[in-house]
Each structure stands twice: as C-alpha cells, then as structure tokens.
Amino acid sequence: MANEFKFTDVGEGLHEGKVTEILKKVGDTIKVDEALFVVETDKVTTELPSPYAGVITAITTNVGDVVHIGQVMAVIDDGAGAAAPAAPQPVSAPAPAPTPTFTPTPAPVTTEPVVEEAGASVVGEIKVSNSVFPIFGVQPSAPQPTPAPVVQPTSAPTPTPAPASAAAPSGEETIAITTMRKAIAEAMVKSHENIPATILTFYVNATKLKQYRESVNGLALSKYNMKISFFAFFVKAIVNALKKFPVFNGRYDKERNLIVLNKDVNVGIAVDTPDGLIVPNIKQAQTKSVVDIAKDIVDLANRARSKQIKLPDLSKGTISVTNFGSLGAAFGTPIIKHPEMCIVATGNMEERVVRAEGGVAVHTILPLTIAADHRWVDGADVGRFGKEIAKQIEELIDLEVA
C-alpha cells in the first residue's frame, strides 16, 4: 500500500521549512521513526522521521526546496497492497482547446427559461445584451441567415502609466518581519486572546539556597564539570510543588470540555536567541535531579541559540518557566503558552535588610511571578501554589546536589 510522507508541523507555529538533506534514496527500505529528511526553519534544524515502514518508491522534493505543511515529500510502500505510485512528474499545462467562434445573432431581449439537455456538463443559454451565445454541452439551434455585423475599428487604448512608488516618509525606516517573528506573534496573540490570566507575585527568601549553592558548586565543578545555576534549583522546586498542585501541569481540552492532567512534567524553558524567543522543554522533569535539570537547561539553551533544536524538544510541553532575572528585571507579566495552564517567572535576586528575631538581617530575596489560566484556577489556587514553591526553595526540600 502506498503511503504519502507529508511535511507536518515542526512546532512553534512555523509552517514551512527548507530541505537541507535527503537521507535515503528511491528503492531504500525505511523503518518507522527512521529519519528521511533534514529540514531547516527559522527556529530549528530537525530530522523528519518516517511514520511508515517499507520501501521508498518516490521522493518528490529536492535539497534546497521549501516545503509547506501538508506537502507530499515521499511515497513509501508498506507491501500491504498495491505498489506505491511512481514519483509524480511535472505535468505540462495542456494546450488550450480551440475556442469556438460564434456569429452573434441579433435577437430581442428574452426572459425564456434555460433549457437543459441530458448528458450536458453545462447547460442552457446565456442572454447577453441582444445576442445569444451557446454554452458548451448544448447544441445551438441553427442560426438564421443574417448579415454579419460591421465592426468599427477602434484605436488602441493608451496605456495608463503605472503610479510611481511612494517614497518612504522622511525620518522612517522599515523592518522586514521574519518567519520566526511572525510565528512568535501568532503564538502570542493566540495565547492572549484565548487565556485570561490571573497573575500573582511572591517574595521568596532564598538565603539558605544561596548558601547551599555556594557550598556545593565546588563539588559540582569537580564531579560534573559545571556549576549549578540558581535557575536549575528554581525549576526543580516548581516541579516538586506540582506534586501537590497537579492542575498547574494540566491543559484545557476544548473539544471534550475538560481539564487534562499531564502525568509527565515537561518544563518549557524560555530561551532568548538572536532570532527571537524559543521554548524547548525538559522531558519528564519529575524524574530528574537538580544536576540533571541543570545539564538539560545548558544543553537546550545552547542548541536553541545555534539552531540545533530538534522537533521533540519543542513538542509536548506542559508548563513553562522564564527567568526575568537574567536581564536584571524583577517583575513582569509573562504570557501563558497555549494550551498550557501556567507559566512561572523568576526575577532578579537582591540582598535586602529584613526584620529577623527582634533585629535586622540581610536576606537574599527572589521575586517569583505566576500567571495561570483564570478560567480553570482562581487567584487563591495560584496563591497556594506559589507558597508551596516558596516553601520548597526556603526549606531546600529535595534540592540536594549529590
């Protein structure tokens, strides 16, 4: 049976890609999930795996082609039925059929009904002014002898000059909208129009975490050849808090009109790249340690900035986290990634003088902002979730570096 290999959505709202490699040739066998093409978009360079197993009977794209969603790229015969069709060849446009010439027959304007004939693809007559023109499929009645009308010669119309291009207004310049920027814009509008957010901000005492991180980074350098970022600890604390508040790891299913709670916690990490925002995700973060999460953050960020992110990295995210603090910002109003339920933002940590045990002390304070879908959770729910995240950070619950 012939199966069409079509270009599917590569994620992040991008609808086209450029073929950079073809990994098989006609006649080769291929397995399910084996890569057949490599496609580059404005955000990712990704392999396209085959959804079918069988023999490749046609490859309908070339290296350098730009393909769009739904476009057939190859044909794979799984051997279950008729052989796959040969590769489609470019079809020359058929020569236009000769247009029959009819001599207009002067006749009075009529309102007679259209006449239909059996077997005619298009039937009847069109009444135009005082002449009758047959339609294909209907045999015209015999014309009455009449002198041909005299056509008066007319002079060729004077072509209208094209309007001159409008000059750019003084003091302005234009910036072309890239495919990636357009995709980001569409995603933001979709989220903003469909998800009414409730947003709360918390102050978290991260003093103990700061001290703990300083004490273990020597170990992390010697054992893992890396320091553990604060962001990795924050992500781990959020994942821990979701155990008590799983609704924030859910999504609304509009077709079934219900909330779906995801078993896996796939944490989307907002990465600022030279070309724009991209949100790959850490898969099954609920099974990972702080060190594992730290490694994933570094890996995803590096590959996002070098356009080496793969399709699976962008799909199936369940909750997102962004770090305003990396830019020195404390607060913001993050936009929830549709169709997720929640996004958590961490701000720039600051040393602050606070009251402590009858006196004052200097504490490290983390601003933490949560935006959640107000259709399905209330501000009080967000408040309890935020307090649980704060507790995880302040008490160093399950944040050990081993």
From Swiss-Prot:
Q: Has keyword Kinase?
A: no
Residue(s) carrying N6-lipoyllysine: K43
Query: Which residues carry out catalysis?
Result: H374
Q: How does the cofactor attach, per the note?
A: Binds 1 lipoyl cofactor covalently.
Provide one Gene Ontology cellular component. cytosol
User: Which UniProt keyword terms apply here?
Assistant: Acyltransferase, Lipoyl, Transferase
Q: Which reaction does it catalyse?
A: N(6)-[(R)-dihydrolipoyl]-L-lysyl-[protein] + acetyl-CoA = N(6)-[(R)-S(8)-acetyldihydrolipoyl]-L-lysyl-[protein] + CoA
This entry's Enzyme Commission designation comes to: 2.3.1.12
Superkingdom, taxonomy of origin: Bacteria
S-S bonds: none
Can you give the residue ranges of the Lipoyl-binding domain?
2-77
Give GO terms: molecular function aspect only: dihydrolipoyllysine-residue acetyltransferase activity; lipoic acid binding
In this chain, the stretch annotated as Disordered covers 82-110, 143-172
Record's compositionally biased regions (Pro residues): 87-107, 143-162
Q: Does the keyword Acyltransferase apply?
A: yes
Q: Which cofactor does it need?
A: (R)-lipoate
Signal peptide residues on this chain, from the entry's feature table: none
Q: Which residues form a coiled coil?
A: none
Q: How does it assemble?
A: Forms a 24-polypeptide structural core with octahedral symmetry.
Q: Which family does it belong to?
A: Belongs to the 2-oxoacid dehydrogenase family.
Query: What's the protein called, per UniProt?
Result: Dihydrolipoyllysine-residue acetyltransferase component of pyruvate dehydrogenase complex
This chain's source organism reads Mycoplasma pneumoniae (strain ATCC 29342 / M129 / Subtype 1) (Mycoplasmoides pneumoniae)
